[in-house]
Amino acid sequence: MKKINHIPTNLEKILLISILTFFIFLTRGSHLLTSFSLPDASFVLFFVGGMFLKEYKWLCYFLVISFGIDLLSPPPELDNLYLLNLGYVGLIISYFLSWILGEYLNRTSIFSTKKFFAISLLLIVSSYLISTLTFYYFSASQIQQSVYDFVLLYFREFFIVNTVYILILLVLIKTYLYVLRNDKVSKIESI
């Protein structure tokens, strides 16, 4: 099978950075669906950044934005000390892993549905486990549940939400590929 990857143009990069920034602001404020925000899509957005932007300066840009949102807009029932603790390092590691998996997918074949789903499953499970377990073990809060119960607490919701985001991403990528191929075909036919 021919390896297919995609290198965006400058205009595509600007558009993608703007879209990712918008959706980080739209989804990062809450982990759940509220009247003001969609469920958190950060891991999938970092995955997209790794796929198409690749450069680590953009990873740093999105990390700063995410950190700023967490710092400046904690949920009313929580304070910054609850959110920003040593366990937060796991979230940063999960974002970095999401970016790396996106880069890897683009290098291997971004349009292979089988690879896309395999890497997406790895993304969802590993990002959840890393961020949840580091919070459990390294946060300063006293968690009354066992580690097993704590991990299972939000996994189903996290898995469903991120699977929906991954499916939306796959449809967008396949649509883009279809339009890109038809655009190239129409340019060739017009010559």
Language-model-detected regions and their locations in the chain:
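Hydrophobic transmembrane alpha-helices
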Residues: 2-52, 57-61
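Membrane-embedded alpha-helical hairpins and interfacial helices in multi-pass inner-membrane proteins
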Residues: 108-191
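Alpha-helical membrane segments and adjacent membrane-interface helices in multi-pass membrane proteins
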Residues: 36-99
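Short helix-perturbing small/polar motifs within transmembrane alpha-helices
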Residues: 2-3, 75-128, 174, 178
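Residue-level signature of transmembrane alpha-helical entry/exit and packing/kink sites
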Residues: 12-17, 43, 58-59, 83, ...
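Aromatic-anchored segments of alpha-helical transmembrane domains
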Residues: 21-30, 64-76, 124-133
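Hydrophobic core of alpha-helical transmembrane segments in multi-pass integral membrane proteins
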Residues: 18-28, 94-101, 170-175
